[in-house]
Amino acid sequence: EYSSETVPRTLYRVGGVIFSKEKVFSMYENRIMIKYTLEDAHSATTLRFRPFLAFRSVKNLTQANGNVNQSYEEVTNGIKTCMYPGYPELYMQFNKKVKFVYEPYWYNGIEYPKEQERGYPYQEDLYVPGYFEVPIKKGETIIFSAGDSAVATTRLKALYENEVVARTPRTSFFNCLKNSAQQFYFRPKEDDAYLLAGYPWFKVRARDLFVALPGSTLSIDDPVRFEKIMHCLLYTSPSPRDRSVS
C-alpha cells in the first residue's frame, strides 16, 4: 500500500510481517532519511539493508569496473565509504547500533523502464559494499540516514520528525500546489534563497526564477520568502553576470 499525504509511505506485507517505510530528503543538507517501522510480527525479526551505490552524475549510468575503492571505515552506528577519488565520503548511519557485513559485489543489469521508454540508455551496474543487519521489535522504529557528512545518531529521530513537520500535507488542491512550489526552494548556503528552474537538469536560471517567483511565494502566502529571494538576487550576488544566470 502506498500513500503520500505528508511524506511517501509504503506498507509491506511479507508473510506474517507488516512493516512500513517512509522517506524524506533534508531541506538544507545533502541527506536522505528513511524510517522503518515494524507494524506487526509473530516472531523475532531482523532487517537487512543492502545499499546500492552509483557515485555518478544523474545524467550518466555506470558499469562494473575495477577502479572502485572498496574500503570503508566504521563510524557511529554505521560506515563511511567513497567509491572514487574526487567524490565526498558517503556516511550511512542508523539511530541504533547495527552490524555491518563486508561483502563487496556488483549487481549487474539493473533496468530503468522509464528511461527505456524515452529511448535513453537504461541498464547499469550498481556496487554494493555489503549489508547491515539490525534486530527490530514490534512497534519499533529504525531510521537510516545517508549523507555526505556525519550525523549525531541520537538526534536522527528528532531530525526526521522536524523534516516531516516542515512538509505541507497534501490534504487539498491548494496544499498540493503549495507543496510542489516549496520543492523548488533552493538554499546552497544558510543565508541564500533561490528557486531551481527544474529537476534534474536545470539549476538556478534568472528568467525562470523571476517568472515563477510570484506564484511560488506570494500566491501561497509566503511574502517573507519572496522578499528574501529578491534581496539575495539584488544585493548578495557578486556581479551582474551572477545575478542573471548561474
Question: What feature does the model see in each segment?
Answer:
Residues 235-242:
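Conserved small/polar residues in nucleotide/adenosyl-binding loops
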Residues 1-27, 113:
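Extended, loop-rich substrate-binding clefts of extracytoplasmic carbohydrate-active enzymes
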Residues 20-22, 31-35, 127-132, 211-214:
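Short alpha-helical segments and helix-capping/turn motifs at coil-helix boundaries
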Residues 26-31, 41-204:
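Acidic/polar, glycine-enriched structural segments that form the non-catalytic walls/loops
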Residues 202-233:
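Alpha-helical support elements that line or immediately flank enzyme active sites
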Residues 246:
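Extended ligand-binding groove/face enriched in aromatic
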